[in-house]
């Protein structure tokens, strides 16, 4: 089980990483991304997996770990030294450190040790390099303990350390050979011995082998401790010859081996497992002793393998049954795993492999007390850290991959017990596989040192353990836990002293596999602040969100991801670097090697106080495509000035290469601005421009420059600056003198400090309510080279020139505005197409000090449109979403009153039930809260909209005659037999700009007399597509049009009497629903039911057909003239003059006599009957 670092992804593409292309777009501060120094190596070797900056007497270097050097045959790994300096172009040199990295007295396996996976510099000189997959062999077993080497400043291995142990899988093996005469050929036995012994690791601390030969007698060919290597044993075995004999004393040979060969005098080791291999070709002559001899072997725990050679029996054609049973009885249980038989001596070699494997299987169980691995698979050196006098070595594979931290100090080595770091009780032998020691670090606090180790698989969410060393014992102080399963919280640890007081300020914990919202491995870094001996959570850092697009089907995707997994793995590397931006605080660099589809990127965070700023100061992407340039940001180191300019430089590695980025110095530029005069007094003109008096102002701007790294030296900076007048306004109220421009741009060389002067003048604008802001922007003339501007200081400064205020002797103007509002309508507004406007009258008064920039702001509902303004003086109104009217110039004095009207027009696209208007009066002067109650007015007026339409009605017949001699048909075959048809037409046509509502048209007509006889019979109706009329039951209710016949009896006709009018007739109504349309039509067909009128007594009467229109929308109304239409159809009977009743004749005669009498009386009164001529003649 080999833990993998999160970014150690399988590399399948061979490439050379030319990091000179790492010039991608970045948010830039003072790390120079365009002039970096690059180092390249095979991506298959994982060149760049680790990087360290290094200096010795020979010069300055970048050390680069390449843990897969030697692949594909082996993965030995190594470290390269790469010379640095702007003038250095020498290639990187492989140090061949694995050659001299060795542990004596063990059988080493270096082929896949991945040397260079861990690389840290020693503060006292030299460096430490580790190969966590270094292994040694115990018998047939390989133990991956890991190894670390101290390397001197001159790149020589000083010593190596690995937690190797004496092989606890030692075996003492005695081979008991039948050397009787029947064994033939003896060379086959020798070949068997050679093949078997070659498979064994023979030595004093490993497996020992002795050989006993028997026939009639027993001989010790050599003892267990005779030879100390496999080679020596092989030479001796090849010299053994067959001693012969006429008897096969198997019991004697086994018993002699038990009693003598397994004694300490002959080299047997106390506590080591005893193994006996018996090889014979025939039944024993002392088989009566075998049972007891085998029992004695059992009592002494001697494991026995027995081999029966059947050659003698096969050659003599003898039965082998009894022989096989005897040899089986010799073998240990289970017999099937300890007994072998071969057809003859030549076949012995065929069982060597199986026999060897079964013997080797005993190695794993040689230590019967070992229930699990301890340090055998520890992978010590998976991580490493120097902490004062201690060296911390992470051993993730220790104790069944629960892990531990090996502490090494001079000649003292502390390997904590397997339960030392268990923070919670666990079941016996429970395999936690927490990977403790995945990363290690330390924190310095006043008077003490805290040691920190990460175990990213603990409880699946990860954990960080903080502990102290007290007299060689581990004392756990605190644990920090991750929040997300599988995030690998604790796989990366970094401590940093931000303020350079020699004490740790922060602990940063990486969780590079932290999943984002879209299940992508975005990564997260947790920041903890040191509080005495405890760490307290402060904040989390996250990368730019990566969009994972497996295809371009998603509209948000512009580029398809070609590599998996997707994300950033932000926090794969977290490095504390010395003060990059020369602000007195150390900084942090974090790697995100999966960003940009595995191209990678790093983020730089600047220190501040005792913490770091949450927002990154610079992001450096690799600029690669994720194929030829992979995982930039896998490793980071930044502790040294490698080019002699006094600034810390940063080395960043990935798979296939590394790059050294130079830091650029930081220029501090401070600017001050002064104005003369310092206020704009529009009533005091001090200059003349183009013949007009105005106000002119002189602006003095002073630049002060210095370098952060060399504050005492003189610095000359080439600057470019731009001055913008009235920068808060879209239209400027001022221009530079001699121009009509609001902006000027100039270059300036500043040596320590320099002042310049620019003058400008005010325009004749009516807008003086706020200050004139003057903005000065500046930058270095060549921002790509040399120092950069300090990002802690602004590169833009602002100066404000206020307007002088008319407040007497007061420093502040305190106004008191009032607002009165009235409207033409208050209760209900009926809006018509020809009359869709209304007025709002405003009165603004100031009862306090002068109010500067007095204005009214009018907000109104969407059903209103600003149309215009009337009667306002001096100023005007602007309308965007609201209406702002400036009142007074430039201020509204005490007692001033301004009256004006705002005209609104109704918006036909928004028909609301109310017109809502909010009006307020305000100014730039102060106004007490208690006087603001009369500065606002709210208006809400109900609104109805009168729909403009034309409602027409007409009929095909207005007069129908019934002949006196007409008869009633006895059988009605069609509607033509009933009477004349009357077609009634209704047309509704839209007019005006208001929308047409849904309408309801009710068409009513006399349908039956009071006695139930038909009057007007509806045969059907038609309409335009937007109209739906009901009920259908009124349409031809008798089914005449469908061919149904009906008869009228004479008795029914005789019942009809006189019809004077139709006031008592029963009315039928057709209701039509009209959807909005420019034109709607409804046509109704009616038949005058003549049988009702033929025998009736009447001379003439009128039938009235009414059409009534109604709006279905409460906001849209109809005018009274457009609601009803009536059509009169006159019915008369020809040939029968109407008889006048007697009472009518008598009443008319009386009325005529009365009128005559009144006329005579009136004439008499006026003297009409007097003769004035007669009187004159009498006189």
Swiss-Prot record:
InterPro entries: FG-GAP (IPR013517), Int_alpha_beta-p (IPR013519), Integrin_alpha (IPR000413), Integrin_alpha_C_CS (IPR018184), Integrin_alpha_Ig-like_1 (IPR013649), Integrin_alpha_Ig-like_2 (IPR048285), Integrin_alpha_Ig-like_3 (IPR048286), Integrin_alpha_N (IPR028994). Ca(2+) 3 binds at residues 641, 643, 645, 649. It is found in: Membrane. Coiled coil: none annotated. Residues 1165-1179 are cytoplasmic. Residues 29-1141 are extracellular. GO terms for molecular function: collagen binding involved in cell-matrix adhesion; metal ion binding; phosphatase activator activity; protein phosphatase binding; signaling receptor binding. The integrin I-domain (insert) is a VWFA domain. Integrins with I-domains do not undergo protease cleavage. Integrin alpha-1/beta-1 is a receptor for laminin and collagen. It recognizes the proline-hydroxylated sequence G-F-P-G-E-R in collagen. Involved in anchorage-dependent, negative regulation of EGF-stimulated cell growth. Heterodimer of an alpha and a beta subunit. Alpha-1 associates with beta-1. Interacts with RAB21. Interacts (via cytoplasmic domain) with PTPN2; activates PTPN2 phosphatase activity towards EGFR and negatively regulates EGF signaling. This is Integrin alpha-1. It comes from Mus musculus (Mouse).
């Amino acid at each position: 089980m080999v833990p993998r670092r999160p970014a150690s992804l399988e590399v399948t593409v061979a490439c050379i990483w030319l990091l000179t292309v790492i010039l991608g777009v970045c948010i830039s501060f003072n790390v120079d991304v365009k002039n970096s120094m690059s180092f390249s190596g095979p991506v298959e070797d994982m060149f760049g997996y680790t990087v360290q900056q290094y200096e010795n007497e020979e010069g300055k270097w970048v050390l680069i770990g390449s843990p897969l050097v030697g692949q594909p045959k082996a993965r030995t790994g190594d470290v390269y030294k790469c010379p640095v300096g702007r003038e250095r172009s020498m290639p990187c040199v492989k140090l061949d450190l694995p050659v001299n990295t060795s542990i004596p007295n063990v059988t080493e396996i270096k082929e896949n040790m991945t040397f260079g996976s861990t690389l840290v510099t020693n503060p006292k000189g030299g460096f430490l390099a580790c190969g966590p997959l270094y292994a040694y062999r115990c018998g047939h077993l390989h133990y991956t303990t890991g190894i670390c080497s101290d390397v001197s400043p001159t790149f020589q291995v000083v010593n190596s350390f690995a937690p190797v142990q004496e092989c606890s899988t030692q075996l003492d093996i005695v081979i008991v050979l039948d050397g009787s005469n029947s064994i033939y050929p003896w060379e086959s036995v020798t070949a068997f011995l050679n093949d078997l012994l070659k498979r064994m690791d023979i030595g004093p601390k490993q497996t020992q082998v002795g050989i006993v030969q028997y026939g009639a007698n027993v001989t010790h060919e050599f003892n267990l401790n005779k030879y100390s290597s496999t080679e020596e044993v092989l030479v001796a075995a090849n010299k053994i010859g067959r001693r012969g004999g006429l008897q096969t004393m198997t019991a004697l040979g086994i018993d002699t081996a038990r009693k003598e060969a397994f004694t300490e005098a002959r080299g047997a080791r106390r506590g080591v497992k005893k193994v006996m291999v018996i090889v014979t070709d025939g039944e024993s002559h002392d088989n009566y002793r075998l049972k007891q001899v085998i029992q004695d072997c059992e009592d002494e725990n001697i494991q026995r393998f027995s081999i029966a050679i059947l050659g003698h029996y096969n050659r003599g054609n003898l039965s082998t049954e009894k022989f096989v049973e005897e040899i089986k009885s010799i073998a240990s249980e289970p017999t099937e795993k300890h007994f072998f038989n071969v057809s003859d001596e030549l076949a012995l070699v065929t069982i060597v492999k199986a026999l060897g494997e079964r013997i080797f299987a005993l190695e794993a169980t040689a230590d019967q007390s070992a229930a699990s691995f301890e340090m055998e698979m520890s992978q010590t050196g998976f991580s490493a850290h120097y902490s004062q006098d201690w060296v911390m070595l992470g051993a993730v594979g220790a104790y069944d991959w629960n892990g531990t931290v090996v502490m090494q100090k001079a000649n003292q080595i502390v390997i904590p017990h397997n339960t030392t770091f268990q923070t919670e009780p666990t079941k016996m032998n429970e395999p936690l596989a927490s990977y403790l020691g995945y990363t290690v670090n330390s924190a310095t606090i006043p008077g003490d040192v805290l040691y920190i180790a990460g175990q990213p698989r603990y409880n699946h969410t990860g954990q960080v353990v903080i502990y102290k060393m007290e007299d060689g014992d581990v004392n756990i102080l605190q644990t920090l836990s991750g929040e997300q399963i599988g995030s690998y919280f604790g796989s990366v640890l970094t401590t940093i002293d931000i303020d350079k007081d020699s004490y740790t300020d922060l602990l940063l914990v990486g969780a590079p596999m932290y999943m984002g919202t879209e299940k992508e491995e975005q990564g997260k870094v947790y920041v903890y602040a040191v509080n005495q001996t405890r760490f307290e959570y402060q904040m989390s850092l996250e990368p730019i969100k990566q969009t994972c697009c497996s295809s371009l089907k998603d509209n948000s995707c512009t580029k398809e991801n070609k590599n998996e997994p997707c994300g950033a793995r932000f926090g794969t590397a977290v490095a504390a670097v010395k003060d990059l931006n020369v602000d007195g605080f150390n900084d942090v660099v974090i790697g995100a090697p999966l960003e940009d589809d595995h191209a990678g990127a790093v983020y730089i965070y600047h220190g501040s106080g005792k913490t770091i700023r949450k927002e990154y100061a610079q992001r450096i992407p690799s600029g690669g495509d994720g194929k030829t340039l992979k995982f930039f940001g896998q490793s980071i180191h930044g502790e040294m000035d490698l080019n002699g300019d006094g600034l810390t430089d940063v080395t960043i590695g990935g798979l296939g290469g590394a790059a050294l980025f130079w830091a650029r110095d930081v220029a501090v530029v401070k600017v001050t601005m002064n104005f003369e005069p310092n206020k704009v007094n529009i009533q005091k003109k001090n200059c003349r421009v183009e013949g007009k008096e105005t106000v002119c102002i002189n602006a003095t701007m002073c630049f002060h420059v210095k370098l952060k790294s060399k504050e005492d030296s003189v610095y000359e900076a080439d600057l470019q600056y731009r001055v913008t007048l009235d920068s808060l306004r879209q239209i400027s109220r001022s221009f530079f003198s001699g121009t009509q421009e609001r902006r000027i741009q100039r270059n300036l060389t500043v040596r320590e400090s320099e002042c310049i002067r620019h003058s400008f003048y005010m325009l004749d604008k009516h807008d003086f309510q706020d200050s004139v802001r003057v903005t000065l922007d500046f930058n270095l003339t060549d921002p790509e080279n040399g120092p950069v501007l300090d990002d802690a200081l602004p590169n833009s400064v602002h100066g404000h020139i206020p307007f002088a205020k008319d407040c007497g002797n007061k420093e502040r103007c305190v106004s008191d505005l009032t607002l009165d509002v009235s409207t033409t309508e208050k209760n209900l507004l009926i809006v018509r197409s020809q009359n869709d406007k209304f007025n709002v009258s405003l009165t603004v008064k100031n009862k306090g000090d002068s109010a500067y920039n007095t204005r009214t702001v009018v907000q109104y509902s969407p059903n209103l449109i600003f149309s215009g303004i009337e009667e306002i003086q001096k100023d005007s109104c602007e309308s965007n979403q609201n209406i702002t009217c400036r009142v007074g110039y430039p201020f509204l004095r005490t007692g001033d009153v301004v009256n004006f009207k705002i005209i609104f027009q109704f918006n036909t696209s928004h028909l609301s039930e109310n017109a809502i208007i909010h009006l307020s009066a305000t100014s730039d002067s102060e106004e007490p809260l208690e006087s603001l109650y009369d500065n606002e007015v709210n208006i809400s007026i109900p609104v109805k909209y009168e729909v403009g339409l034309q409602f027409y009605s007409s009929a095909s017949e207005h007069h129908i005659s019934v002949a006196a001699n007409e008869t009633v048909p006895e059988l009605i075959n069609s509607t033509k037999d009933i009477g004349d048809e009357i077609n009634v037409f209704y047309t509704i046509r839209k007019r005006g700009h208001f929308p047409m509502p849904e309408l309801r048209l009710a068409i009513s007509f006399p349908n039956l007399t009071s006695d139930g006889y038909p009057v007007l019979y509806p045969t059907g109706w038609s309409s335009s597509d937007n109209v739906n009329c009901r009920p259908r039951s009124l349409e031809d209710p008798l089914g005449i049009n469908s061919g149904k016949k009906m008869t009228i009896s004479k008795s029914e006709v005789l019942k009809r009497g006189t019809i004077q009018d139709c006031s008592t007739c029963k009315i039928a109504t057709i209701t039509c629903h009209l959807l909005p349309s420019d034109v709607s039509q409804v046509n109704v067909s009616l038949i005058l039911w003549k049988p009702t009128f033929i025998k009736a007594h009447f001379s003439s009467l009128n039938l009235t057909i009414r059409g009534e229109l109604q709006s279905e929308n409460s906001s849209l109304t109809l005018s009274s003239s457009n609601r009803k239409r009536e059509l009169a159809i006159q019915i008369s009977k020809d040939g029968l003059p109407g008889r006048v009743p007697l009472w009518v004749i008598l009443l008319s005669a009386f009325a005529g006599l009365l009128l005559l009498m009144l006329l005579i009386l009136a004439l008499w009164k006026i003297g009409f009957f007097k003769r004035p001529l007669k009187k004159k003649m009498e006189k």
